[in-house]
């Protein structure tokens, strides 16, 4: 119960899904958790649930792609706790893009603004605080599609960029005792996944879950908690010699040839879903 006791951890996109699971686990293991999200209602709910379980947490609204909002939120966290050790860059968007000759520039810009620029901005404003109280750990939540390809080019490219940025930062900040690692989830059943499944699978969410389960070596989809435990390891001192690496948590999915199931023809040029699930 004390794997990150006494540490202060920021979790972006912490109001739902992987971020929520991570925030709750870090709090359970002794960290004071700072949640950043654009979803105020669920962000405050997660804080309330953490406190009800005798944990410590606070929430600040911020769009990670907007520098002033990130700066303000991180200053508020440091003002309250007076220290900072862990940053989990989890906030992200899933926007398709479609074939290059049909894709729209504004969609490309949105994906990279949140998935890449957002992680950079959070790192920019967390590092000075971590340097004061370190050592520290930054965990960037990427995707298996930052390693292998799908047909969602903008998303894949953004996660590949975040993976590369992680490695660069791992080198830059190693002597400052701040470790950087990336975590690469496979198919995880989250509110965001369910929203996408409703859009692309004519037979519904249940069918999508079933097909992604039977095409996985472990015969199931992942849960937010599966990823949260990986993040906990990378955030804790247990991984003090782990730096600049990728942790894939996908049930073995990318270790075998892909099994693709038929849904319908997806027009990725119009498909658009943001951080806040319905």
Residue ranges and their predicted role:
Residues 2-34:
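Canonical Rossmann dinucleotide-binding motif of NAD(H)/NADP(H)-dependent dehydrogenases/reductases
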Residues 97, 243-278:
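Short C-terminal tail/terminal secondary-structure segment
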Residues 98-100, 104-109, 212:
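Substrate-binding pocket helix/loop in short-chain dehydrogenase/reductase
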Residues 120, 218-249, 254:
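C-terminal substrate-recognition "lid" of short-chain dehydrogenase/reductases
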Residues 123, 158, 166:
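Active-site helix of classical SDR
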Residues 143:
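Residue(s) in the substrate-gating loop at a strand-loop-helix junction
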Residues 174, 179, 242-244:
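Short, small/polar-rich loop/turn modules that mediate ligand/substrate recognition or access, typified
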